[in-house]
Amino acid sequence: MSNSNEQDNRTLTLQRIIDAPVAIVWEAWTQPDHIAHWWGPKGMKTKVIEHNFKAGGSWKYTMEMPNGAEFISEGVFSEIVPLEKIVTSAEFKPMTTGVQLQALFEAQGEKTVFTFNVVHPTEEYCKQQEQMGFMNGWGSVFNNLEDYVTSLIK
């Protein structure tokens, strides 16, 4: 049994305020046509292979690097609260495996407070992922997300 302190020690978190309404940010996260535009660090191309957006549904995306190398990201959605929360398992082979992603959305007027948690299986693995560039990698992904959703409302 794990307590919240143990989970805190296994969790890396990014938070930002996105200058777009929560409904638009939510749509960007939940619709395959949108996901392909922003998922992945800058310079990568994403192809949505599968996106069964419901609790128990699977998702699978490929990310192609500029040199042509491909990475697969995939998981299973475990919890979806419309306009508030998405929880999914995630594998980013070969770099990251066995993690849980928690995307939290909170309306703040016409802006969205977006919180992203990645829960790792162990504290050691969490530290290793942080040292491998977690903040820069996911920061780049969410820069793409922010640029994309703000372009939708212009």
What residues fall within each predicted segment?
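Hydrophobic ligand-binding cavity/cleft-lining segments
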Residues: 1-45
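Intrinsic-disorder/low-complexity, polar/charged segments enriched in Ser/Thr/Lys/Arg/Asp/Glu/Gln
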Residues: 9-15, 22, 46, 58, ...
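A structural signal for short, well-ordered beta-strand segments
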Residues: 14-16, 103, 116-118, 138
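Hydrophobic pocket/interface hotspot
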Residues: 25, 35, 59-61, 77, ...
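Ser/Thr-centric signal marking residues that sit
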Residues: 30, 112-115
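A solvent-exposed, acidic/Ser-Thr-rich amphipathic alpha-helical stretch
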Residues: 32, 41-56, 61
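Hydrophobic-ligand binding "helix-grip"
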Residues: 36, 42, 50, 64-109, ...
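A conserved amphipathic terminal alpha-helix motif
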Residues: 120-154
